Amino acid sequence: MIGHLTGRLVEKHPPEILLDVQGVGYELLLPMTSFYQLPDIGQQTALFTHLVVREDAHLLFGFSQKTDRTLFRELIKTNGVGPKLALAILSAMSVEEFAYAIEREELSKLVKIPGVGKKTAERLLVELKGKFKGIQQEDFFIESQHLKQPEHALNEQDIPASEAISALIALGYKAAEAEKLVKKISKPALSSEQLIREALKAAL
């Protein structure tokens, strides 16, 4: 299994990137929490990876931190949670925020993540509660954090806004919902990555 890759960043189309590793191009899907930390195109970057093998495709997921990959692996062990939903969860919350929500049994926060209904959220609470406390600090670190919600508007005609909307749709949001979230952000100078970050915060 491919566990780690270091190479030159060739393309960035959230949540997907193309990484050149010694002449071989690897397509990876990243949660937005990892995507935000990527360098500029042409720069070197290193990612922890997890390979998902399906009958119709081999999907490679990348993570900036080992803790993100650890949580991803825990999530896909949960009944009813596949790689796409795990990616959406990690895009909506940091590891610390998710662990805190689980330990505090914040069902209302979990159901706001696209693709997570009440039954799935309840299953996550049952299957993951308590797992974070016994894991070493280098794997998980729980702290109290609450997301701030922006309350402004944005011109949807901006190219970064269009890219942000496309990325949110890829993460499981409906088109109308993605557009509404991006419109709430009032800073047209923001990059697509910044817009995605703020939109995901607003969704929670």
From Swiss-Prot:
Pfam families: HHH_5 (PF14520), RuvA_C (PF07499), RuvA_N (PF01330). Keywords: Cytoplasm, DNA damage, DNA recombination, DNA repair, DNA-binding. GO terms for cellular component: cytoplasm; Holliday junction helicase complex; Holliday junction resolvase complex. Residues 1-64 are annotated as: Domain I. Homotetramer. Forms an RuvA(8)-RuvB(12)-Holliday junction (HJ) complex. HJ DNA is sandwiched between 2 RuvA tetramers; dsDNA enters through RuvA and exits via RuvB. An RuvB hexamer assembles on each DNA strand where it exits the tetramer. Each RuvB hexamer is contacted by two RuvA subunits (via domain III) on 2 adjacent RuvB subunits; this complex drives branch migration. In the full resolvosome a probable DNA-RuvA(4)-RuvB(12)-RuvC(2) complex forms which resolves the HJ. The RuvA-RuvB-RuvC complex processes Holliday junction (HJ) DNA during genetic recombination and DNA repair, while the RuvA-RuvB complex plays an important role in the rescue of blocked DNA replication forks via replication fork reversal (RFR). RuvA specifically binds to HJ cruciform DNA, conferring on it an open structure. The RuvB hexamer acts as an ATP-dependent pump, pulling dsDNA into and through the RuvAB complex. HJ branch migration allows RuvC to scan DNA until it finds its consensus sequence, where it cleaves and resolves the cruciform DNA. This is Holliday junction branch migration complex subunit RuvA.
